[in-house]
């Protein structure tokens, strides 16, 4: 492999085939002198953590329409941002987003630091996000390695060590390809190659601009890279969700500020535990005395466990809850929106 030939081939492909993304200034714009907006780059990178481009894009457009600058986002109420984030999942990202926006607004005059080290000093910015913003927004020669890049590098070099143990080696190998020339475009070219050509299960090797340099392709089985260890069985938890209505309103609660789905509006629930709840036990934990009916169950997958919620529904009053219109539930986290819709038989 000749690194300079590989870089030239991939950058030429990127110049012609770069994805058109809502937050991106493409190669043509860059050549015309259009600068990347650090706020948009940062926001997109946070949203894209554990989230696909098609799913994140409407949220990005909604956020930038409502909060066009980091300063505008910084002064917003926490609950408004958390509600706008609902459906993207991984809600700690939204809390970190606000903490970072406020640090930029209050401590940096509304201007993002323009170095990787400076960005690492902001709350909620890990090594990957800091490197990505530094490269894409400020053209700093940083080593930007996400899941797509790990896959590309593992195949280019036919790395035999399985993930996650291979991560340090993949990062080291990726670093050997970083140059001062076009570092932002280079980072995005690797990402685009992984997203559109070097796919996990069906790589389009016949369309790959760097196929001639791919050691995994030379083995005849590029789809077997990166190597992976067997996945552990994901634990299963159980709980009860209580759907209490009063006319056209539904009872909600705000979850504790720390922990899973912290600070979000939610249906009242029991604790979540390793075993299922019987009907009598489920009713005993209900938030109000009412004629509770078992109306079904929903299952939801979190990152580290699967949750099954038994659904109990009743009509009545309760103290210590927030009454919300049935038709205004889109701000709920996905698991509770799914539960509410199932319990109400989609008649919101």
Predicted segment positions?
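Catalytic cores of DNA base-excision repair glycosylases
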Residues: 2, 8-9, 13-223, 236
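Intrinsically disordered, low-complexity, charged terminal extensions of DNA damage-control enzymes
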Residues: 1-26, 192-348
